[in-house]
Amino acid sequence: MLWSFIAVCLSAWLSVDASYRGPTWQRWVFKPLTLLLLLLLAWQAPMFDAISYLVLAGLCASLLGDALTLLPRQRLMYAIGAFFLSHLLYTIYFASQMTLSFFWPLPLVLLVLGALLLAIIWTRLEEYRWPICTFIGMTLVMVWLAGELWFFRPTAPALSAFVGASLLFISNFVWLGSHYRRRFRADNAIAAACYFAGHFLIVRSLYL
C-alpha cells in the first residue's frame, strides 16, 4: 500500500500544482489519474467484499464529476449530479454497516455548518440554487452517517471513513464558497487536498 499511497500523493500534488502554474493538460491528466489510482487501490483491498463495490462506484461517479467540471459552465449541473451520486453511494456504504443509533450533537453541528454555507452562497446560486442545496444536504447526510458509524462502532476503519467524509465536506465548503462568493489564493489547493485526502481515507478504511 505504501507505493500506491506515494503514487496517489504525487498525482494529487501534480493536479493541484497545475491549478496555479502548470499547463492545462497537466490538470486534465492528473486529476482523473489520481482517482483512477484510488480505484485501483480500492480494488486491491484485502477486506474487499460485496458492499465495497459501493466505494468503487462512488469513486467512478466522482471521476465523472471531475471530468464534467473540466468542461464549460453548462456542464456544471451534470457535475453536481455526479458528485451527488458519489456521496449517495458512500452514504449507502456507511449505512449498510450500522444499526440505528443517534448521537444528536453531530447532526446539530452539521446543520449549523450547512446553514452557514448556504448563507454565504445563497444569493449567488441563481438557477443552481436547488440542485446545490440538494447536493449539500446529501453531503451532510453522508458525514452524519459516517460519524454515527464511528460512534456506534469506534474502530479504525470507521474513524478513517468518518474523517474522509468530513474532508469531502470541507472540500465542498471551500469549493462552493470560493466559486460563488469570493476567491482566495489557496482555495484550489485546500479544496483539492481535502477532496483527494477524503477519498483516500474512505478507500483506506477497506484496508483496516
UniProtKB/Swiss-Prot annotation:
One of its GO terms (molecular function) is hydrolase activity. Its main location: membrane. The chain crosses the membrane at residues 35-55, 76-96, 102-122, 132-152, 156-176, 188-208. One of its GO terms (cellular component) is membrane. Pfam families: YhhN. It is a multi-pass membrane protein. Belongs to the TMEM86 family. This is Uncharacterized membrane protein YhhN. It comes from Escherichia coli (strain K12). The lineage of its organism: Bacteria, Pseudomonadati, Pseudomonadota, Gammaproteobacteria, Enterobacterales.
